[in-house]
């Protein structure tokens, strides 16, 4: 397609800023269990394969899960800008941090919800949400569109917004694909086929946004 896509699999390195959810048979801290860094990376690598298969040029902020691969957020946005990406994805999953358990996708872009810093960020974020919510393998506790500006979502940050988006000049946003502390979803996110579905929906969103030829084969979930 000639497109240039930059993928940032969020977090990295099984470190203190990572997110570990202990579910049987994995103990807390077991790197074979659920860690957001691993899950994000798997999705990113599969998305890269899908996009490159369609002729896109793809750069990633990391391709391994080591401490040294967890780049500074300013470095990530600078790399995406210098790469002259047509689209930037920061891939994450979410958590409530409380005893409340919910599960739905959420898209965050720079600016106010009704006044994005870059209007195209919101356009493509809405497209991705539409595709992610099509996933019927999981259970969504709500299906209404959740696409919000980070200045509204973090009102106490004085319009600082998310670090990875702060200095981003190319079109892009951060996605929270689902809630990894919703235990059924935790188990699903340990399954490579399930993570592939999310990557597939990212690729579909790219195809729709850029109005490029779609895939010639489907994916049966």
What is the meaning of each model-derived region?
Residues 11-15, 36, 64-69, 93-99, ...:
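Solvent-exposed loop/turn segments at secondary-structure junctions
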Residues 36-39, 43, 47, 60, ...:
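Stable alpha-helical elements in mature extracytoplasmic
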Residues 45-56, 81-85, 93, 129-138, ...:
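Sec-exported extracytoplasmic/periplasmic mature domains
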Residues 90, 94-98, 144-220:
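Active-site-adjacent mobile loop/cap segments within catalytic or ligand-binding domains
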Residues 120-158:
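Active-site-adjacent substrate-binding region
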